[in-house]
Amino acid sequence: RIVAELRAKGIEIEIVSGDREDAVAEVARAVGISIWKSGQRPDQKIARIEELKKRGRHPLMVGDGLNDAPALAAGHASISPSSAADISQTMADAVFQGEALAPVVETLDVSRSTQRRALENFAIAIGYNVVFVPLAMLGHVTPLIAAIAMSASSIAVTANALRVGLEWQGRTRA
């Protein structure tokens, strides 16, 4: 289910594992992942991440083992379950509770929502600067009106940023 959700969001998924070929092949087949590599050392995992970065990708590394720690550090972003080795948790950008991968989808959704809000906030700030600063400079609005508009734009930016938290508050995934 998680793999299907990620694919629906346009995410390409690969397994790059240090485990045996038969085990990796079985997991990949069970979850529907066609690109996988087994028997990978930490340096090989890093090489794959670097290759993806050179192609303009932003790889998210998900790992839990000792040998995943260097690759977690190399990923554009990385997450690890709370059951992971301590070094993997330390090297990951975020740690999620449990072992199920549902938080990967939620993390992606929250990050995309945050990015949208940031772009909206830039638009609000630019809009203020394009409209009210020239009007104030030309004397078409009083300093009081310009100050009120500046405060209103700051409040609008803050309120818009708070929408991310409100959007995700109370949501849980099964």
Model-derived regions, located:
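Structural signal for membrane-spanning alpha-helices in multi-pass inner-membrane proteins
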Residues: 132, 136-137, 161-164
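Short active-site segment of divalent metal-dependent hydrolases/proteases
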Residues: 67, 132, 156
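Conserved ATP-binding TGD loop and adjacent catalytic N/P-domain core of P-type ATPases
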Residues: 1-120, 128, 174
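Alpha-helical transmembrane segments of integral membrane proteins
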Residues: 120, 124, 145-146
